[in-house]
Amino acid sequence: MEIEICCGSIQSAANAKAAGAKRIELCQNLNEGGTTPSYATVKQCVEELHLDVFVLVRPRPGNFVYNELEIRTMEEDVRICKQLGVAGIVVGFLHEDGSIDTALTRRFTELAAPVPVTFHRAFDRCKDWKKSLEEVIACGCKRILTSGCQPTAMEGKETLKELVQLAGDRITILAGSGVRPDNVRELVTYTGVREVHGSCKVQTKGGYDETCAEKVVALLKNASTITR
């Protein structure tokens, strides 16, 4: 069972590391769905914390339809993140009608190679998830981060289960959104996912969210006891 902790700052990443996490998705502005983190933060996570860092490449909040200026920025982000030694790139592209932008998705998997690409929760906004699954696979992505097209993974567990069955060994279904220590066993057992994604966040006295080491410890512990 692989666990990915979503971290929105260098301190959150350090907390996840201290709790035993090996892999993180790194972003900033988590409350807005996440945007691309600073290069310094990426560098610290890779070189000082020695984590497997999957970097979210998203230039702004909002929809997943980008203009050429934004796309060029994202391409440069990917190039720099590869130079910094990241373990994965996380992106997602849609057309206005909610279909997968396959041309852009393929363009970014080729640019990122040999670094693997995760297609993020833009997938949950697609209009036809079965068709979209096949398109994302054909574009060369290695993972799909999804809640089963529902607000949380538990609410989307029926779709997640079907996604796992349809995907087989062709792509990894990474279940995320609302994954907690108290529901991870039920989610994994029911859906058959082999990887889960959780933020394990709490609000600090400073009024911002941060990854909670105790929650990460509990999530890792409960996930480690799952038997198939």
Residue ranges: model-predicted function:
Residues 9, 30, 59-61, 95, ...:
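Active-site-proximal loop/turn and secondary-structure-junction residues that shape catalytic pockets
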Residues 23-35, 80, 84-96, 141-154, ...:
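Glycine-rich phosphate-binding active-site loops on the catalytic face of alpha/beta enzymes
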Residues 17-18, 42-54, 79-85, 107-112, ...:
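Acidic (Asp/Glu)-rich catalytic clusters
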Residues 8-15, 65-77, 124-139, 163-167, ...:
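Catalytic cores of alpha/beta
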Residues 82-134, 139:
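Hydrophobic, well-structured mid-protein blocks that either form specific transmembrane helices
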Residues 3-5, 24-26, 53-57, 89-91, ...:
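Hydrophobic faces of well-ordered beta-strands that scaffold small-molecule active sites
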Residues 10-12, 35, 42-102:
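Active-site beta->alpha loop and helix N-cap motifs at the rims of alpha/beta catalytic domains
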Residues 34-61, 100-122, 155-181, 213-228:
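Alpha-helix-loop-beta-strand connector modules within alpha/beta enzyme cores
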